[in-house]
Amino acid sequence: MKFIYTTLIALLLGSIAPHVLAAEEVTLFDRYGFAVAYIDSGNLTIYLWNGEPVAYLQRENETRFNAFGYNGKHLGWYLNGVIYGHDGDAVCAIAERLNSTHETDPRSRRQFVRIKTATGPVPPLPVFFNTFSAAPCDDVLGEGASR
């Protein structure tokens, strides 16, 4: 009886776990459709694909978040699945916002989340465009890691 109960629990967890994990992480792609970062939706931390935590999201209103680096620097805004830079161009986006994406490599193991420093001022909101910035996504997000 214990074996049957254990087997049922294992099957149930096995069928639920992939959906839970998928809902907890949101992959961000660069302008070329390569996965370069992801958001842990549990604590709103943005990790580079190598596992380095570089930024986090802070809710501004119902639909928009500010992206701050762990060094306190404002990096941009997250809105409708896109991270926009200060010039209003997209820096990275979720797959559903792109025409196509490339197959993703396995991510590296997550590093420990850093201590947040005091945030700097939020710049004026730009006009958001449907074009990608020339600045690479991982470079822009990586600016949040520097001290």
For each feature predicted by the language model, list its residue ranges.
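Long terminal segments
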Residues: 4-6, 11, 18-35, 42, ...
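N-terminal, post-signal-peptide region of Sec/Tat-exported proteins
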Residues: 40-76
